[in-house]
């Protein structure tokens, strides 16, 4: 997958949909996340219990882990390279389980875009994220709000003080 670091706020349009690559969520991901976060619930740490007693007859993965992986998949597209702040995560819904060895990908659609009133040269994007499993079933959805840099004008200096070039970071 090639990463495009040239996306600025100006390059996003309401209605655009971006699809990430897929990623398989492994048992190692589950164990590392549960250990790091301290979410030692039996359904996550006891394979026999998960098989016999969980609603899903298998090792379900914490929803928050899926949100983290989904955000990572979106970041890997390069579309957040000129991001300046993550302003919010709202409307989180977990609609179906993700089990170990499921493969997910994310469809990200631009819901709204406006220039920032408090940060000149920046815009605010609201985006809907739909996380889908290998069967096309939506497992999680949520909305993010991000602050991104606008494309610099040719005479506007970049971070290193040099005039902007096409694709140069602001």
Model-derived regions: residue spans:
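Hot-dog-fold acyl-thioester-processing enzymes
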Residues: 1-88, 153-170
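HotDog/MaoC-like acyl-thioester-processing domains
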Residues: 1-13, 94, 98-170
């Amino acid at each position: 997958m090639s990463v495009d670091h040239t996306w600025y706020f100006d390059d996003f349009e309401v209605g655009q949909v971006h699809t990430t690559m897929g990623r398989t969520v492994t048992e190692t991901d589950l164990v590392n996340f549960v250990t790091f976060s301290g979410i030692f619930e039996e359904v996550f740490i006891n394979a026999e219990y998960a098989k016999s007693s969980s609603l899903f007859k298998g090792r379900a993965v914490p929803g928050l882990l899926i949100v983290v992986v989904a955000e990572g998949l979106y970041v890997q597209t390069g579309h957040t390279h000129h991001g300046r702040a993550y302003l919010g995560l709202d409307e989180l819904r977990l609609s179906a389980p993700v089990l170990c060895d499921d493969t997910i990908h994310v469809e990200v659609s631009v819901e709204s875009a406006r220039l920032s009133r408090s940060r000149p040269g920046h815009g605010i994007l609201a985006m809907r994220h739909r996380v889908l499993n290998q069967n096309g079933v939506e497992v999680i959805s949520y909305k993010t709000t991000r602050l991104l840099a606008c494309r610099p004008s040719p005479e506007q200096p970049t971070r290193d003080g040099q005039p902007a070039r096409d694709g140069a970071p602001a």
